[in-house]
Structures are given as structure tokens and as C-alpha cells.
């Protein structure tokens, strides 16, 4: 029987526009754009040039620091252009897709008979190893490290999050194959929610299943690592998004790379919130054609409202695009007397409004911050929504002043920026906590290089 871990700290935010469990397949488009900067910590080095032909699974670029880590093309076709920014930074690789897709055949493999090196080499060869992330630093992993464990969280509980049980339908065999492959490299832990009932999750083979019972962010893999096997200095764990586990399984079951993923279209500015199947690199302009209720005063988010990034129709599906969210920008909002006026249609984590009496009522929130940055107030706000054994407020202050010794002592090795998403939401100081944590992780990584 699976171990159950109960969490009390956290906050569930119910928003209008949850994706209905209906799906449409995005039709083939002529151009795809792969953006290397969506792979955190990777310094891309191109291995293709304009005019080159590639098949699905061929490498487009490698990590300059670890050249054996390749990144696969999601489609076959011709490299149409390489988009660059300041100092020739690679912003995107634009691919002109073939009408009939051609796949690089890596050969089917029975994962039960493979060694750890066989699995690692197969993922490296197919350009999928870079989808594995590591703690500390929350970056694409170093293939030369040996993790003490591999963690997969199948629980997505952020606002408007993609329901992985729905995404899993039809992919059960590939998911189990992917888990078995990971278990060859290290002890693998699968975290699920108490309400998840899919047999391949509850009775997953070759992994240790842990049930998490509690509010958001119980689904964050960093939270699960903190409660199962905390990361100390000198230790490394790998983390894998459950969608990428499916990618790995497809590789071993078919011998081909298939980067088709299920994406939730959510938010109050979506005409019909639903799911779509789209390849990595698919432009948002294709996915969101006729899908939005407005074009003005719109905040388009690549991801969910808490951890996603501000986006636009020229963006494309990336490594973290499990959701595309559309909410009002709020620039045209005019509220008489502001927060002083009692309201029933506003959400509050305190008792300023009546939301604490409304149960699971869904709210139509916009993108306004409603205030500027203020001094940090040591009020315990972060701790109320951070179910980890760390001192969040002290850690943030130590990062801001650049105290390396202090941030190590305060537990930065086992956190990711997303672990502070809720703390950022409730923060009365209006600080960009996720950005601060990312800066701290990058600073520590550079110090330890």
C-alpha cells in the first residue's frame, strides 16, 4: 500500500475557465519554432544551419557545456531560419515542415532488459535526455552525475492546471515503460494525489508510489522531494515531468521520437476552455485561432497563472507548456474605493473580502499586481503556503543580499522557483519571488562551478 503524506500548508485558488475534458487535435502547420531558452540552464550550440534537412529526432542543438546532450527536432523538414537576439543569443530555430513526416528510427527496445547505461545512452542519442531536470539548481541535468533518486509528480494542482489523468488516457503503456526506464538509472519515486484513481498511477510498477493529501502546492516536485528525500549539499536528485515520461516510453516502445503533448487551454478569456494535442514548437497563433474572447486587454500566459510566463501569439509550445492561459489584463478595471469596498466577487487570502465564506467559488481574476514593491514584512505569509522545512522569508532576504553561506544553510538546494509561486501570490510586499529564487540558484551554481 502506498505511503500517504498529509500536508496542511498551502492554498487552492479556484479560477474561472478550467479546461473541459474535451479535446481537439491541432492540424498540421507549415512552420514550427523550437526555442532553446525554454530549457533552463542549457547553453545552446547549433548543429544545424539554415537550409539543412532534418528528420524527427535529429539533433537541432546541443548543450555547449555537455555536448553529448542533444535536443531533438519535433518535425521533419528544412531549417528555414535561426532567430537571434543580443550578442547572437539563439532565440528560436524555425522549421519548414514536410507534408509527410519522416522519422529517425532509433529501434525498439525492451526496457526490462536494459542497463542504466543503455537507458541513458538511448535518451542521449534520441535527444531526450535534456528533458530531465535536477535539484539542486532546477536546471537541465548534468549526464555525468549519479542521482540518489528520480522524482516524478503526476499531481498538477496549480490554478487551471492540466489534469494529468486526462492526458494519460491512451498513453498508459508508454507512461509505464518510461517509469521502468527511469527506474533502471536510480530509485524512482512517483507522487500522486489522493483523488487520482488511474490504475497506472495507483499501481505503477518499478517505482515507489507516494500519495500526497493536501492543498496546492502538494503537486510540486520540489515539495515532494522535501518530504521524501531532502537534498543536502553534495547530493543530486533528478526530476521528470510526467509528460516527458510518456515521451521516453514512446521512444522505447516505437523506436521513434514523438513530442506530441496534451495542453490545457484555460482562463476566463478562452471562448471554450478545452484540451488540445500539439507538437512542441507549434505556434500559439495556430493553437489559439478563434479560441479567444478578446484581443485587447488580454494577458496570454505560457503555462498556468502562477508559474507561467507572459506570452504572445508569436510564441510557440515549449518544454514547460502544459497549459496556455488567457485572462484579462485588468488595465481597464476601475474599482471604486479599491480594497476598502466590501466585495463578493474578489478573492482574498485574508478576510478582507468574503471569499473565505464562498467555499470553492471560482473567480475571474486579472493580471494586476494591485500595488508596488514594499519592504519585506516578516509576517509568516510565506510559511503559511510553503509546506517545506525551510525558512522562506529568511531565504529570500539572504538571496537578495547575496549571502552564499546563508542561502546554503537555509535550504536552497531543494527548492525551485515554482515552489515560491504561492508565496509570491500572497506576498504583501509584491516581490517577484520566483525571479529572486532563480537568481539565487544561478548565483549558487556559478559559485560552485
State what each model feature region is.
Residues 1-47, 62, 212:
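N-terminal, Lys/Arg-enriched amphipathic/low-complexity engagement segments
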Amino acid at each position: 500500500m502506498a505511503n500517504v503524506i498529509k500536508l496542511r500548508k498551502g492554498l487552492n485558488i479556484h479560477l474561472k475557465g478550467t479546461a473541459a475534458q474535451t479535446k481537439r487535435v491541432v492540424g498540421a502547420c507549415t512552420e514550427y519554432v523550437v526555442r532553446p531558452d525554454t530549457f533552463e540552464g542549457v547553453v545552446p550550440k547549433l548543429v544545424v544551419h539554415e537550409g539543412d534537412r532534418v528528420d524527427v529526432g535529429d539533433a537541432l542543438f546541443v548543450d555547449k557545456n555537455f555536448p553529448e546532450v542533444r535536443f531533438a527536432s519535433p518535425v521533419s523538414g528544412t531549417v528555414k531560419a535561426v532567430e537571434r537576439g543580443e550578442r547572437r543569443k539563439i532565440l528560436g530555430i524555425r522549421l519548414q515542415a514536410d507534408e509527410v513526416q519522416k522519422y529517425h528510427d532509433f529501434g525498439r527496445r525492451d526496457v526490462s532488459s536494459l542497463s542504466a547505461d543503455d537507458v541513458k545512452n538511448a535518451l542521449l542519442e534520441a535527444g531526450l535526455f535534456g528533458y530531465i531536470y535536477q535539484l539542486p539548481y532546477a536546471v537541465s541535468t548534468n549526464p555525468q552525475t549519479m542521482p540518489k533518486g528520480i522524482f516524478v509528480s503526476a499531481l498538477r494542482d496549480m490554478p487551471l492546471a492540466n489534469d494529468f489523468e486526462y492526458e494519460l488516457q491512451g498513453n498508459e503503456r508508454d507512461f509505464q515503460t518510461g517509469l521502468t526506464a527511469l527506474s533502471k538509472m536510480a530509485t524512482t519515486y512517483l507522487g500522486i494525489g489522493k483523488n487520482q484513481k488511474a490504475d497506472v498511477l495507483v499501481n505503477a510498477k518499478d517505482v515507489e508510489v507516494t500519495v500526497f493529501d493536501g492543498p496546492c502546492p502538494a503537486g510540486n516536485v520540489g515539495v515532494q522531494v522535501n518530504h521524501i528525500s531532502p537534498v543536502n549539499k553534495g547530493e543530486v536528485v533528478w526530476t521528470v515531468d510526467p509528460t516527458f515520461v510518456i515521451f521516453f516510453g514512446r521512444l522505447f516502445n516505437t523506436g521513434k521520437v514523438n513530442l506530441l503533448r496534451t495542453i490545457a487551454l484555460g482562463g476566463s478569456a478562452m471562448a471554450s476552455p478545452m484540451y488540445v494535442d500539439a507538437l512542441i514548437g507549434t505556434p500559439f497563433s495556430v493553437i489559439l485561432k478563434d479560441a479567444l474572447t478578446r484581443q485587447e486587454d488580454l494577458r496570454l500566459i505560457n503555462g498556468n497563472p502562477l508559474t507561467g510566463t507572459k506570452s504572445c501569439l508569436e510564441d510557440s509550445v515549449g518544454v514547460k507548456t502544459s497549459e496556455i492561459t488567457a485572462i484579462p489584463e485588468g488595465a481597464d478595471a476601475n474599482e471604486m474605493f479599491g480594497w476598502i469596498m466590501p466585495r463578493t466577487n474578489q478573492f482574498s487570502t485574508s478576510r478582507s473580502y468574503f471569499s473565505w465564506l464562498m467555499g470553492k467559488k471560482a473567480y475571474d481574476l486579472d493580471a494586476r499586481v494591485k500595488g508596488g514593491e514594499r519592504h519585506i514584512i516578516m509576517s509568516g505569509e510565506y510559511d503559511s503556503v510553503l509546506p517545506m522545512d525551510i525558512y522562506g522569508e529568511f531565504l529570500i532576504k539572504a538571496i537578495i543580499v547575496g549571502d552564499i553561506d546563508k542561502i546554503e544553510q537555509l535550504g536552497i538546494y531543494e527548492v525551485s522557483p515554482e515552489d515560491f509561486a504561492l508565496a509570491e501570490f500572497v506576498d504583501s510586499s509584491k516581490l517577484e519571488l520566483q525571479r529572486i529564487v532563480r537568481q539565487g540558484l544561478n548565483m549558487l551554481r556559478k559559485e560552485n562551478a
